[in-house]
Amino acid sequence: MKRFLIGALVAGSLFATGAIAESAPNTLGKIKAAKVINVAFASNALPFSFVGTNNEPAGYSIDLCKRVIARIGQAVGQPNLKVNWLAGSTPERLRMVATGKADLECGNTSQTFARLASVDFSGLIFVDAGGIMIRADSSFNSMADLDGKKIAVLKDTTTEARLNAIVQKHLVNTRVVQVGDANEAVAMLESGSVDAYAGDKIKLVGLAAQTKDPAKFALLTEEISFEPYAMALPRGDAALRLEVNRALTQVYLSDEIEAIVGRWLGVLGRPTALLSAMYLLYSIPE
């Protein structure tokens, strides 16, 4: 059977550059003057970024982000830098960074060339794959079985773009249903309003784990996309990007990364060979 039950389980380039703007932003100067850093984050992307205990942001990406924020605080001479957390969807978070409303973005955002037109990115923080979640009691064993069915997907995401390409080429009778919220998609899948939900695999596992009965859901083994996660940054700000990547390198080279992975992704077992290689490749020498 080409799927596995989720209930049995209960994470660009080294220097994403982009074109240099005529007047490069001085985000570090802005943060130093305000003594505040504005950080856009995903409020419902367990286990990467979500609203946790005491209504505070939590997750794998948030832990990395806090290390980055501490490094930025040191760089601007504000070790107790105040953090203003700004929740939003992926398009909203990218817009916040592009317009200057947010100085940094932390979530489960994939780096793409299309997005590099408006923002820069840090080194990679995670690598995932797009997958398909179904109900465990369904008869679907492969993507081909979903021809003529309804698949939910978050609108304006990299998964949506890849899913549409697959549908147009291989599943011409399938209907792609755009949704604005992950919980809405899970509810639609559980009720039978849709037959499947496409998203990043680790996030799908996290969403199922939040339901009353995770064993009701399963993942097809097929992968539909490659998702390289990174932190979105203001475009053209090399000084900020330097501090962000230095902070990430320090975490990757220390025991901290094992603790962070264990805390948020430990239920899935040890990091994959690909993820381990990513930590090594993005550990930039001084």
Q: What is each of the regions a protein language model found here?
A:
Residues 22-105:
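Extracytoplasmic small-molecule ligand-binding "clamshell" domains
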Residues 66, 77-145, 284:
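Acidic, polar ligand-binding/catalytic clefts
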Residues 22-23, 159-177, 215-217, 248-286:
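Ligand-binding clefts/hinges and TM-proximal coupling segments of bilobed small-molecule sensing domains
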Residues 91-92, 106-117, 162-169, 187-225:
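A ligand-binding cleft/hinge motif common to bilobed small-molecule-binding domains
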Residues 22, 59, 63-71, 137-140, ...:
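Extended ligand-binding regions for polar small-molecule ligands
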Residues 41-45, 86-91, 100-112, 136, ...:
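Beta->alpha turn/N-cap motifs
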Residues 43, 126-137, 201, 208-248, ...:
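Periplasmic-binding protein-like
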Residues 38-47, 57-74, 110, 128-182, ...:
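Bilobed "Venus flytrap"/periplasmic-binding protein-like clamshell domains
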